[in-house]
A protein has these predicted regions:
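Nucleic-acid endo/exonuclease domains
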Residues: 1-148
Length: 148
């Protein structure tokens, strides 16, 4: 089985009975920047010891193996409750998943860059994705960011 947009093989896991939704516009834009820079990347990177409720693996949007960097594109639903995505309980659960990914990377000295949706229009190339302000340095990285 292959991904629709990238043609990458999909690895199915025994304990996962769903596939991720298609990429958001922000994720698609990041893919275009990575490809333009000829940067190798993996989509939906998982680790066997990183999972959420009901043992569902938590996924990173992108992993760049040559740079050992993870990138997450955080849409508006990461910063405020949006009824088309979820209710308040679901929003809080998503925030907790973000914190868990942050903590996971910090504990293992893995680099994680979080790109907030309102910054996307200022990003024009691969190097722009790696701005210091996007590098996660705290479990609560997103908690103090507010959309303009």
């Amino acid at each position: 089985m292959r991904r629709l947009l990238s043609g990458e093989p999909i690895k199915l896991r025994a304990n996962v009975n769903f596939l991720r939704l298609p990429m958001s516009k922000g994720e698609d834009y990041i893919v275009s920047l990575l490809r333009a820079a000829h940067v190798k990347f993996e989509r939906e990177k998982t680790y066997p010891d990183l999972h959420g409720k009901r043992n569902v693996p938590l996924r990173f949007d992108f992993y760049l193996p040559d740079y050992q960097i993870h990138i997450e594109y955080d849409g508006i639903q990461h910063y405020q409750q949006i009824s088309q995505f979820t209710n308040h309980k679901g929003y809080l659960a998503a925030r907790e998943r973000d914190r868990k990914k942050n903590s996971y990377c910090l504990a293992r000295n893995l680099k994680l860059y979080r790109i907030p949706y309102w910054e996307l229009s200022t990003i024009h190339n691969f190097n722009d994705l790696l701005r210091p302000q996007y590098l996660v340095k705290s479990k609560f990285h997103n908690d103090y960011l507010t959309p303009p």
